[in-house]
């Protein structure tokens, strides 16, 4: 029976490259040189700047760097900025994996579409099976057309 998996993954190497490019861009900009920094650990990116407007500019630099490296910026989750001494900090979480709420939403979308496929939640992914390859391709088109707030990838397509 044909099937595929719906996942949400990040290419960590591309994210690291994008952060490195953002750091280089920060050093190139005259107005931001030496006044801000990016710190990347695991799935958390900490932005440090002298003022809020600099922080906003750094976020834009980061977004542009991620887009250039073909990383979907929907995976970014912004925490509130906070003052720490003379600097302002903000954490950006890189979300990965499909959480239970989103998985339930995907399953509900598939069921409501009346396609002849079944969706099952398996940890941080959703497995969709059907009798025909065409039905699975319709399910992929349906999910791509929806705005779910997370970048989705479709892999492990089996006939």
From Swiss-Prot:
SUPFAM superfamilies assigned: YajQ-like
Similarity-based family: Belongs to the YajQ family.
Any single GO CC term annotated in Swiss-Prot or TrEMBL for this entry: cytosol
PANTHER family found in the cross-reference section: UPF0234 PROTEIN YAJQ (PTHR30476:SF0)
Function: Nucleotide-binding protein.
Keyword field contains Nucleotide-binding: yes
Pfam family, one: DUF520
Protein name as catalogued: Nucleotide-binding protein Avin_13410
Keywords: Nucleotide-binding
Organism: Azotobacter vinelandii (strain DJ / ATCC BAA-1303)
An annotated Gene Ontology molecular function: nucleotide binding
